[in-house]
Structures are given as structure tokens and as C-alpha cells.
Amino acid sequence: MKRPEKEAVVAQLTDKFRNADAIYLTEYRGLTVPQISELREKLGRDTSYTVAKNTLVRIAAKEAGIEGLDELLAGPTAVTFVKGDFIEAAKTLRDFAKTNKALIIKGGFADGTVYDAEGAKKLADLKSRPQLLAEFAGDIKATMSKAAYLFNALPTKAVRTIDALREKQEKAA
């Protein structure tokens, strides 16, 4: 690759680094082209799975202000640039690696933190944002239902007490 081509690749990678919400690094040695295509399809439209030279990835990451990826850039490395829900992308990579042993998750970068392989795999165990929001909404609804029951129970209890007193007075008379 000639220098102008390398500069163009670095510029593209730098742009991807700057626009990504998260980055995962994987070793793809042993994966076939159809397997890589399948992985790209599973990752979805908001995620790109890019194979590039480690030196170019290293330069682009530094230009984008991301430090600490050097240790992870050894051997054949593919970079997964994620826009949006990076937890879901981590789950997709983890599940794909389970069925395709050739894919090895090396680590990642999300929310300003560099993760090693174990850290990146732990991200896959977290609940996604939509799941957390659904649980939160369910908790709020349950709390509101309990409050409505309690507010309704007070007048009902008062009415029952008054009824019991009235019946007691009628029997006494």
C-alpha cells in the first residue's frame, strides 16, 4: 500500500473511531469470508466490522484521542465500530465466538475505558438500555399501583369502620 492510500485509510479509520460509541477488537484468523459476512449481518447496520493493518489502526486511534489499545493490536485484528447499543453488539460478538471458535474477542473501548478480553465479555452480560428502561418503567408502574391501592384503601377502610359503628348502634337500640 502506498503512502497516500495509507493516509486515506487512516483518515477513514479516524473518522470511524470518532463517531463510534464503542469499539471491539477481535482476532479473525481462521474465519472464512462467508463467516465474516454472516457476522457483519448479525451485527447490523449501525455496526461496521473492519479489517485493517494494526499500525494504521494504532495511528487512527491516537488521532481520534483513544489511548491504550496498543496491547490489543497484536496479530490479525478486526475492529468493530459500534454506533448505538454497544451492549447488544458485545452480545452478538460473544455469541458468534461461541459458535465460531476462530473468532477471539481481544478487548474493546467504551465510555472512555479500554477493556481487556474479560472486560469486553463482561459487557455482553450487562442488560441493554431498552431492557433497563423497560424494567424501570415496570418498577414505576408497580409503585404507582401500590400507591393507588393505598390511597383507595384509606377511604374504603373509613367507610367500613363507619358502617360497623352504625350497625353496632342499630343493634344496641
UniProtKB/Swiss-Prot annotation:
GO terms for biological process: translation. The keyword rRNA-binding applies. It comes from the Bacteria. Keywords: Ribonucleoprotein, Ribosomal protein, RNA-binding, rRNA-binding. The keyword DNA-binding does not apply. GO terms for molecular function: large ribosomal subunit rRNA binding; structural constituent of ribosome. GO terms for cellular component: large ribosomal subunit. InterPro entries: Ribosomal_uL10 (IPR001790), Ribosomal_uL10-like_sf (IPR043141), Ribosomal_uL10_bac (IPR022973), Ribosomal_uL10_bac_type (IPR047865), Ribosomal_uL10_CS_bac (IPR002363). Forms part of the ribosomal stalk, playing a central role in the interaction of the ribosome with GTP-bound translation factors. Belongs to the universal ribosomal protein uL10 family. Part of the ribosomal stalk of the 50S ribosomal subunit. The N-terminus interacts with L11 and the large rRNA to form the base of the stalk. The C-terminus forms an elongated spine to which L12 dimers bind in a sequential fashion forming a multimeric L10(L12)X complex. This is Large ribosomal subunit protein uL10.
